[in-house]
Amino acid sequence: KNIIPKYKDLYFDPNNEYSVPYNVGMVGLVYNTKMVEGTPDSWSIMWDEKYKGQVLMFNNSRDAFGIAQFLLGIDVNTTSEQDWKKAYEKLKEQKPVVQSYVMDDVFNKMEGGEAAIAAYYAGDCIGMAENNPDLAFVYPKEGTNIFVDSICIPKGCQNKDAAELYINFLLRGDIALANAECLCYATPNRAVLDNEEYSLRDNEMLYPDEEHTPTTEYFHNLDSETLMLMTSLWDNLKIEGNDVMSVYIGLITFAVIVVVYFIYRTIRKKKRESMY
């Protein structure tokens, strides 16, 4: 009863038979106001030559392709091979300006001023901004991905009654409030949003007003053929260009280690022979 209606009956569980919404998140741009001119309003800034070597991109195929797809006006759940290849070409075009493809590394890099701009999840950007007051956050005008983390009971659960009690416990107003404060993600729980003690209830990163609320799309599960296509294109993207040099360096390093090892073995063998 505490769950806001718009987060019920989602595409992956139309009648909420199997899941209960727990957290809500969206992807946006976190940027350093001392390094970026003005307020960005488009994903296109992540392709801007002006910020070459200062852009952090998701090291996550679905999110990375999603950004390119939003920028190109392509459905993020498309099954068209041509659409996925268009997004791939857009990501290839971006690669020369990317400093690094990151996930958790984004925290140290953005908080430490090592990069100017990154795409990441709104809830995590709250912590970044607390650790570096020069950081700001915005949702691009082209739209973005929204996701709802949900709680489920596994099919093989041996104590279904206890599992249901635990879920009800998590949905309780005071417990849901503690979770929302700790995790810093948006909550789908009305009891939390109505609580004046909730410190993030007016946070624009989590709850943007109507004017700043972006167009959103949920990532649906891709069919196996489309998933294989995306994975293949992503692998191709990562091994091209600068990453090829990394592969060469790795191979050379390995070869040097092998040579040094055999030289060491040879010297050691000769020393042993000289003792007899």
Regions found by a protein language model. Give the residues of each.
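Ligand-binding "clamshell"
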Residues: 13-16, 127-139, 201-204
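Mature extracytoplasmic/periplasmic domains
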Residues: 154-214
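Short, hydrophobic alpha-helical packing/hinge segments within bilobed ligand-binding/sensory domains
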Residues: 43, 106-109, 125, 163, ...
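Periplasmic-binding protein-like
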Residues: 84-93, 131-157
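Solvent-exposed loop/turn segments at secondary-structure junctions
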Residues: 27, 34-37, 53, 61-65, ...
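Extracytoplasmic ligand-binding site segments that recognize negatively charged/polar headgroups
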Residues: 1-114
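A ligand-binding cleft/hinge motif common to bilobed small-molecule-binding domains
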Residues: 111, 117-134
